[in-house]
């Protein structure tokens, strides 16, 4: 696998017990897994800024976690962040999200699986990610399904994950490179380094050249 554009901080060189505990949590729970945090660990304040925001806004918060998870992976599929897009939230899975739900993301409006509430949140993610007009029709739709605190949290989260994913995709980071040995939060077919390589080599891989050609043809 390629080397990242910015080096990982080796956990063995860290003396901060709290940072080590957070990296171990990433190893055991995922989303995020350790690699992205091992990059942020170059600046401890950034490491903790992300960890705390992710805990408070994504893992917890006032809006449904599964809806935020769909928005997260919608962003991954849109900006082609493979590192983020090949992870799945374990908590969202416990709340009923299944792999088939992710497959409809880029065509969410015509999905027969996703609810109207989920589609409204994804329309919000679409507008933010692609700089689309946020007209009265969109906002009426959003207010029909969400409270104002939920809209603040979902919008803030989409902006947070979009910025991080646009950055991370430039770094060439990959799973199973830092504190490996677990499959925590990996998407099906990406649980080990060997499985990841096989899945990324498949013709139907979501971020592969064939998928890119399909997306461009659909535009």
Predicted regions and their residues:
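Preference for long, well-ordered alpha-helical segments
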Residues: 148-198
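Short, thiol/selenol-centered motifs that function as redox-active sites or metal-ligating centers
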Residues: 68-89
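Acidic/histidine-rich alpha-helical segments that form the ligand environment
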Residues: 117-157
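Short acidic alpha-helix initiation/capping motifs at coil-to-helix transition points
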Residues: 45-50, 80-84, 128-136
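Iron-sulfur (Fe-S) cluster-binding segments and ferredoxin-like electron-carrier domains
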Residues: 85-104
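Short alpha-helical scaffolding segments that buttress acidic/His motifs in well-ordered protein cores
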Residues: 40, 54, 70-75, 105-106, ...
């Amino acid at each position: 696998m390629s080397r990242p554009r910015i080096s990982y901080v080796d956990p063995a060189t860290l003396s901060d017990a709290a940072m080590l505990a957070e990296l171990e949590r990433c190893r055991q729970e995922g989303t995020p897994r350790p690699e992205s945090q091992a990059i942020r660990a170059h600046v401890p304040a950034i490491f903790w800024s992300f960890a705390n925001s992710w805990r408070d806004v994504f893992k917890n918060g006032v809006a449904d976690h599964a809806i935020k998870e769909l928005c997260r992976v919608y962003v991954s599929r849109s900006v082609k962040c493979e590192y983020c897009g090949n992870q799945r939230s374990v908590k969202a899975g416990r709340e009923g999200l299944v792999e088939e739900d992710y497959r409809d993301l880029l065509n969410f409006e015509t999905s027969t699986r996703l609810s109207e509430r989920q589609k409204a949140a994804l329309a919000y993610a679409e507008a933010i990610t692609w700089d689309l007009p946020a007209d009265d029709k969109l906002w009426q739709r959003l207010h029909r399904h969400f409270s104002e605190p939920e809209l603040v949290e979902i919008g803030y989260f989409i902006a947070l994950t979009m910025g991080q994913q646009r950055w991370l995709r430039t770094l060439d980071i990959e799973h199973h490179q830092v504190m490996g040995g677990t499959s925590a939060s990996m998407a099906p077919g990406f649980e080990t380094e060997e499985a990841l390589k096989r899945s990324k080599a498949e013709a139907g891989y979501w971020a592969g050249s064939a998928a890119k050609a399909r997306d461009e043809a659909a535009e």
